[in-house]
Amino acid sequence: MCAGAQFLHRDSEDMTRNLTTAALIGLVALGAACGKTETPTTPSPNGTNTNIYYTAIGASDGIGFGGSSPCLPFSDCPTGTGYVQTLRRRLAEGGRTVDHLNLSIPGSVLSKAVFDLAASVGRPIDSLAGNFIDREAPFVSTATTHLTIFAGGNDANTIAFAARSRGGDVNAFVDAQVRQWGIDLEDLVARIRTRAPNARIVALNLPNLAASPYLAGNPTVEKSLMQRVAVGLSDRVNALTTRNVLIVDLMCEPRIYLPANYASDGFHPSDGGYAVFTELTLPALRDGTNRVPSTSCAQRAVFP
């Protein structure tokens, strides 16, 4: 079976191993730093304090993989072309001081539930990558004033592959996995709030991966399955509005689906794709702009 016909987390094994090894070293350093007493000022993104502490939670997207200048995990990477790196530069416009912590780990998934699911169907996620709840949330700085979350890409591939592998009622299986994922996402947000209670949290929902180039050659039945997963996960992100989280609507943005905005693997964004991510995220992250995500756009139902 060709690679495009499989539902996998799309980071190559060699790339994931190398980058997650670097991430593990970084986590050890972060753990040592977090062991020290922190005495930050209270985060107040809506106040007059011009200082910003921007934390990013994500997977390979957070290091700009697929772009022309990807970063090593936890590196400063001031010239990176990913959305996290560009957002940092945009936040600094006007002379504001911006501290930054990028916790993104390539190959990572949201929670242990997805991590265990991948192992159960013979597609284990690298143990160094782990999951956001265990490997990223504990290291959110208490000084954080602004934070982004982008979760679901690797998770969607894992859930869709597991559904196809297990057979039976695939829709019921997917819906159960999506419900658990939503519970775990709320847990992630709660853990972040414990670490940084006043931080402005912005979550990017998931595009309809069924319409992405990496699945272009797959049968319609598999695309429909992925659509069910991606729309379901995206809706769980959208539900975070009830928890005072601002949502960026990638699902319903037509430019997200332009071939030029994908890297050569058809899964990760290109520089152009990351530029769209940045454009859509900046108003919410910098200004607190709240735009209600659509529940009826055409991109939610590309396939039957």
PLM region descriptions:
Residues 2-4, 8-32:
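Sec-dependent bacterial lipoprotein signal peptides
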Residues 31-52, 289-304:
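Bacterial Sec-dependent N-terminal signal peptides
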Residues 53-58, 62-64, 99-104, 145-150, ...:
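Structural recognition of the beta-strand scaffold that forms the well-ordered cores
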Residues 56, 82, 86, 173-176, ...:
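Extracytoplasmic/secreted proteins, especially bacterial periplasmic and envelope-associated proteins
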Residues 60-64, 105-111, 152-158, 207-212, ...:
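Solvent-exposed loop/turn segments at secondary-structure junctions
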Residues 67-183:
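Conserved SGNH/GDSL esterase-like catalytic core that processes O-acyl groups on lipids
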Residues 88-96, 187-202, 232-249:
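A structural motif corresponding to the C-terminal end of an alpha-helix
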Residues 206-304:
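Catalytic His-Asp segment of secreted/periplasmic serine-dependent ester chemistry enzymes
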